[in-house]
Structure formats: C-alpha cells, structure tokens
C-alpha cells in the first residue's frame, strides 16, 4: 500500500522559538501527545539535537524507535519513527504570526506486509490526532 499522508495546522499564542523548543523536545511529548505513555531517552538530560534517538511507549503497546531528522530552530523540525513493518514521518514548520506562530504538521505513515493495513488505518486518523495534540500543546503553552 502507498503511504498515507496527513496534515494539520494550529495557531499558538507564543513565539516560534517557544513552540519549537517545547514540541521539539521528546521529554515533553507525554504532556501533550494523547497516545503516548512514556519516552525513554538514552540520556535523560540530553538536549534535543539532530540525530537524537529515543523510544516511545504508546497506549496500544507500540514502542517505536524515534529519531530527529531535521532541527532548524525555530523554523523546522522533523522526526522518523519505525516499529516492525511501520514507518512514520512528521515534519513541523513554524511560521511567525502577529499574535504568535502557526505550527504546520505534515507527515506520512506506511506499512509493509502484515502492517500495511494497520498503517493505512493509522494514517487516516493521524491528521485528526496530531491536530488535537497540537491544540493541546498550544493550550499548555498559552497558559504558561
């Protein structure tokens, strides 16, 4: 099956650098990403950087290995996640706005073999899920 693409955009009432620093740090993920239980970094104090890798544990038991593949503060950030026959990418773009910034999330999910159908289903839901997660992150940052 071909990759399933998704997209979402959310306005944040903070500067692009603030949104970038929060969203681009895997240690913050369990606070705003609804499907995530925990993040395991090889070194908990490691600052986010290009090539940083970690493992996530999701509510459904999936434990993908994640890696930051783009780190251009404060304008662009990307990651790739792999778990068994599934691969997912996420790219975040940070656009300055008069009242803060807009975060644009684009990505795709693909699966091989027995994982093709579950990946396609996950891809259909990903745009809605990332939109909801980004709105939660915007609320968290807006209240600080």
Where do the protein language model's features map onto the residues?
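Hydrophobic ligand-binding cavity/cleft-lining segments
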Residues: 1-46
